[in-house]
């Protein structure tokens, strides 16, 4: 009965020093996914959650991890992707924070396309099966909205149930209580 929320402190999170951040170096998405899945597995083994009723949601970096999980795992009943990156190779050229990408992936996509493919949800789209809700701010410049459309189209092309909500007038984050509540519901 009820609900349990697991807030994963996935590897690479800020504020824990260089060693912790480097756990995600050239393993972005992959390592994060392991952290999320191991947390869920622990809750299932403890008998605290029904494995058939587990969902996943995240925003920004968490949205990227959710996008990665929707294309690489069948562990969830449903997934919500909020302002998530779907393709690192094109993101490198289309964001205002290219250094962030280099800090985690180590090179640009022209010099190391393999690492960009490994860590991009769109690379794994053929494995997608989880019903997915995509949420994105209309004027997001950090993760421009075409990444949401790309993921949606990839899921639709594979027959995966997908819905998309575009928050009119918003950028990368939701700042009004009504919009925040809507994203959580």
For the regions a language model picked out, list residue spans one by one.
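Active-site-proximal cap/loop segments of hydrolase catalytic domains
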Residues: 1, 7-185
């Amino acid at each position: 009965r009820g609900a349990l929320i697991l807030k994963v402190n996935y590897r690479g999170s800020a504020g824990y020093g260089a060693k912790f951040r480097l756990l995600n170096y050239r393993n972005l998405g992959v390592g994060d996914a392991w952290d999320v899945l191991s947390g869920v597995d622990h809750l299932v083994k403890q008998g605290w959650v029904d494995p058939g009723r587990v969902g996943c949601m995240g925003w920004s970096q968490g949205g990227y991890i959710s996008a990665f999980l929707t294309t690489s795992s069948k562990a969830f009943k449903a997934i919500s992707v909020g302002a998530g990156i779907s393709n690192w190779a094109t993101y490198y050229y289309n964001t205002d924070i290219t250094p962030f990408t280099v800090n985690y992936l180590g090179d640009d996509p022209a010099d190391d396309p393999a690492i960009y493919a490994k860590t991009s949800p769109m690379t794994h789209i053929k494995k997608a099966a989880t019903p997915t809700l995509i949420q994105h701010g209309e004027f997001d410049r950090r993760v421009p909205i075409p990444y949401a459309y790309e993921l949606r189209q990839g899921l639709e092309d594979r027959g995966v149930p997908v819905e998309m909500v575009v928050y009119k007038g918003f950028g990368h984050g939701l700042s009004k209580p009504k919009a925040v509540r809507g994203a959580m519901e």
